[in-house]
A protein has these predicted regions:
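Flexible loop/turn connectors
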Residues: 1-94
């Protein structure tokens, strides 16, 4: 069993935490779990360490890139970095 899981979404992380609990494992005592997207719709998610992505900024940047790519289809691809924030909560311990 790994020491930690980093999940692609908070939804997946919450399901994983439920499955771990059914197998008798404790989060974070036995295994740490982290999500991604800070989508708190589940009661388990309020204790979930996650990475918050600023969706408005992401959407704006994506729209600009699509429009640019339509206008200039042969330009090289670029790497875009966007701000995010780790929200440390109980699922990864102290």
């Amino acid at each position: 069993m790994p020491d930690a899981f980093v999940c692609a979404s908070d939804y997946v992380a919450c399901i994983l935490m439920q499955l771990l609990e059914k197998r008798g494992l404790r989060v974070p005592e036995d295994v740490a779990v982290s999500g991604f997207d800070n989508n708190i719709e589940d009661l388990l998610a309020e204790n979930l360490t996650t990475v918050q992505v600023f969706n408005e900024e992401l959407g704006s940047r994506l729209a600009l890139q699509i429009l640019y790519r339509i206008k200039y289809p042969h330009t090289p691809h670029e790497v875009t970095y966007l701000e995010s924030k780790v929200l440390y909560r109980a699922s990864t311990g102290d």
